[in-house]
Amino acid sequence: MASIDDDDDERTPLLQDSHIGELVETQKQLKSRWWSIRVMYLTMFLSSVGFSIVMTSIWPYLQKVDQSADASFLGWVIASFSLGQMVASPLFGLWSNHRPRREPLVVSITILVAASCLYAYVHVPASHNKYYMLLARTFVGFGSGNVAVVRSYVAGATSLSERTGAMANISAFQAMGFILGPAFQAALSVIGETGITINGISLQVNMYTAPALMGALLGIGNIILIFAIFREHRVDDLEKNVSSINSESEVTDVEKANEGPIDQIAVISSNILFFVVLFVFAIFETISTPLTMDMYAWTRTQAVFYNGIILAAVGVESVIVFLTVKILCKKTGERVLLLGGLAVIWIGFFILLPWGNQMPKIQWTDLQNATIHNTTQWTSSIPSSGNHSVEPTGCPVIQTWCLYTPVIHLAQYLTSDILIGVGYPICNVMSYTLYSKIIGPKPQGLYMGWLTAAGSAARTLGPVFVSQIYTHLGTRWTFGIICAFVALSLLHLTAVYKRLIPFSTRYERL
């Protein structure tokens, strides 16, 4: 394996070590280790599916089971997944540090299965059904807190030379889960709203509940695979030894063997950078539908359909990028790619800044409704087209910025989508990979839990932030603030650049 020189540190992947010896591993251990890693890939995929498989149907399902639910409560239902995951991630991570990882994995997936079943039964209670849905989604998120355990296991079960590829694969499976979840929902929509009812257990299987039940069945299959195939392995940071860790005593032995403190500044900086990456991507996901409806006068149906196609294309693009970074990392390094990914994200949002003299089409509906008592006679003289429920389109006049802020052209929007679809997956993979190497041989469960919690907090706060800024201040302020936010992150990354090195490399330099 190639060695690295200090002078060539910038272009050498950080996954390499100058004093790496031969890896002591039998063929049986190698096979078991990689089959266990593949089970973790599947676990990550199913966790993502659990989030996305009901996303397109949550709003109509919520309205069906509880007519008192409004759009603001829908926001809480959507955010509850990330809140549950944010709370659970450090807890499961800490658990995995002191016990075999099979325990938190099985418990978390069991919670996810139970919560998915609860989601399918929220129609049963006589009242307060919306709160049962909120509870169900919270616990689905809580069960998905096992992603910290998954990433910490893969980080510990791979050598430095294997880790970037393994982390890229995890992110690719996560992205595929987000892409295929809505596809599963679309396929199951043929069941219809009525579906079938199993009276003995009060279960309604319809287009809203079938995806959740499918998620529960996949979770049960995941648990079976964990018991049948998953075995815990660990590769030390010098890649000289592979050990099995499948009992409490073996976990304790590993903890005692790892000496030396972790660079906490590098750890905190990595969490901050990861928060920024997830924060801006959550904003990107949230704003796509209202932005296109306001800028291009798309109807709700058009916005959902066209943005669904765009986001699916971005998802496919992201999977390709996830797989490509494994090759790029061998020629550059994680830090260089992270810096480049953030720069691409900044360009993507900068392109969205409005310019020119063309204004968006204005939706005057709100003004007309406010003065309808003065115009009843005038409107009654207009010939009827037979359609009494034409959906108003355009930028609502109640958003006063629509009157003086230039339109964002469709070419700007599509170019931004492409760039963000490149920058986000690069930053995602590099953040996890660098973070795992900074922690080194230490138990990574709790640390990965904090990183996952930072991402969950970002996915919770991002939509809240953008909904307020966009509605009241408009596109110029929204994307201007995001550009400033990403620019500050680039400066922060530059400041801590030399500290973002593997644990083993740091102690070689001391």
Swiss-Prot record:
The chain crosses the membrane at residues 39-59, 73-93, 104-124, 133-155, 172-192, 210-230, 265-285, 303-323, 336-356, 407-427, 446-466, 477-497. It is found in: Lysosome membrane. It is a multi-pass membrane protein. Keywords: Glycoprotein, Lysosome, Membrane, Transmembrane, Transmembrane helix, Transport. Residues 1-38, 94-103, 156-171, 231-264, 324-335, 428-445, 498-510 are cytoplasmic. Glycans are attached at residues 369, 374. The keyword Membrane applies. It comes from the Eukaryota. Signal peptide: none annotated. InterPro entries: MFS, MFS_dom, MFS_Domain-Containing_Protein, MFS_trans_sf. One of its GO terms (cellular component) is lysosomal membrane. GO terms for molecular function: chloride channel activity; iodide transmembrane transporter activity. GO terms for biological process: autophagosome maturation; lysosome organization. It holds the Pfam family MFS_1. Residues 60-72, 125-132, 193-209, 286-302, 357-406, 467-476 are extracellular. Gene3D superfamilies: MFS general substrate transporter like domains. This is Major facilitator superfamily domain-containing protein 8. The gene is mfsd8.
